[in-house]
Amino acid sequence: MFSLKLFVVFLAVCICVSQAVSYTDCTESGQNYCLCVGGNLCGGGKHCEMDGSGNKCVDGEGTPKPKSQTEGDFEEIPDEDILN
């Protein structure tokens, strides 16, 4: 019974690992997918471009990294304006 549980756990881990998308360092040609959030992994003056098919290193501006929200990002609305 223990070995059956161990086998099921092992099988689940294998399935999860096989479904993962692997990202590598971007090549100079920009063919490899890359991670844009949390750091710019594109070398050689290239920038990361995010789209539906995957992130690629490209020449030019690329897509800006998402900005985290902080307290100063939003203008406070006075209570009087909300209640009226």
Curated annotation (Swiss-Prot):
Disulfide bonds join C26-C34, C36-C48, C42-C57. Residues 1-20 form the signal peptide. Keywords: Disulfide bond, Glycoprotein, Protease inhibitor, Secreted, Serine protease inhibitor, Signal. It comes from the Eukaryota. The keyword Glycoprotein applies. Residues 59-70 have a biased composition (Basic and acidic residues). Residues 59-84 are annotated as: Disordered. The keyword Disulfide bond applies. GO terms for cellular component: extracellular region. Pfam families: Hirudin. Residues 72-84 have a biased composition (Acidic residues). It is found in: Secreted. Residues 21-23 are annotated as: Interaction with thrombin active site. GO terms for molecular function: serine-type endopeptidase inhibitor activity. SUPFAM superfamilies: Leech antihemostatic proteins. Glycans are attached at T63. Belongs to the protease inhibitor I14 (hirudin) family. Hirudin is a potent thrombin-specific protease inhibitor. It forms a stable non-covalent complex with alpha-thrombin, thereby abolishing its ability to cleave fibrinogen. This is Hirudin-HM1. It comes from Hirudinaria manillensis. The lineage of its organism: Eukaryota, Metazoa, Spiralia, Lophotrochozoa, Annelida.
